């Protein structure tokens, strides 16, 4: 699957640790995909996540079946071996994960590559690299979904990074329906979220509101 920045519009990120009952995870993923998510990232990380390799591979394969059903890319967070093993469409790399240069060498253009960049220095460094497709930038607003999220950037700083970047940016961190319009106004290509999706009720209605803002 070739990268298209439209993939970043409604970017769902989650792992089993993000739902109260692990049995609800795959149904929730399908519900959000069916309602119009444009990408899904399996981020199985932190307290109460799956650490058994066989179980994780099985979960990733099931997620891939769902993303293929709805014709959207599956990204694997910080696990090149897993991404390659299941032929995921993409890999997302954080600043504290495996070095991006190593990841690019390993995937050799076989998948979409996203990199977390949250400072001017990180964006400038990314601008010097070939093989990256997009940057994930945040946290834009305060969030409790990611323990390592750091201080919030705010929309003014986000816009500065968007203007600095050679690559399309997807915003993440504390994004809600209320602050989504100002987030999109910075020039980002889309937004990513965890709890906004995993805790969503009345999914079709909420997703229609999101689509209206993102396409605005």
UniProtKB/Swiss-Prot annotation:
Cofactor binding, note field: Binds 1 Mg(2+) ion per subunit.
Residues where 2-[(2R,5Z)-2-carboxy-4-methylthiazol-5(2H)-ylidene]ethyl phosphate binds: 143-145, 174, 194-195
Binding site for 4-amino-2-methyl-5-(diphosphooxymethyl)pyrimidine: 41-45, 77, 116, 146
Amino-acid positions noted as binding Mg(2+) in the UniProt annotation, renumbered to this chain: 78, 97
A GO molecular-function descriptor: magnesium ion binding
GO cellular component, one term: cytoplasm
Pathway as given in its UniProt record: Cofactor biosynthesis; thiamine diphosphate biosynthesis; thiamine phosphate from 4-amino-2-methyl-5-diphosphomethylpyrimidine and 4-methyl-5-(2-phosphoethyl)-thiazole: step 1/1
Superkingdom to which the source organism belongs: Bacteria
Class of the enzyme per the UniProt entry, highest EC level: transferase
Pfam families: TMP-TENI (PF02581)
Gene Ontology biological-process annotations: thiamine biosynthetic process; thiamine diphosphate biosynthetic process
EC number of this enzyme: 2.5.1.3
HAMAP family documented for this protein: TMP_synthase
Protein name: Thiamine-phosphate synthase
Species, as recorded: Pediococcus pentosaceus (strain ATCC 25745 / CCUG 21536 / LMG 10740 / 183-1w)
Lineage start: Bacteria, Bacillati, Bacillota, Bacilli, Lactobacillales
GN (gene name): thiE
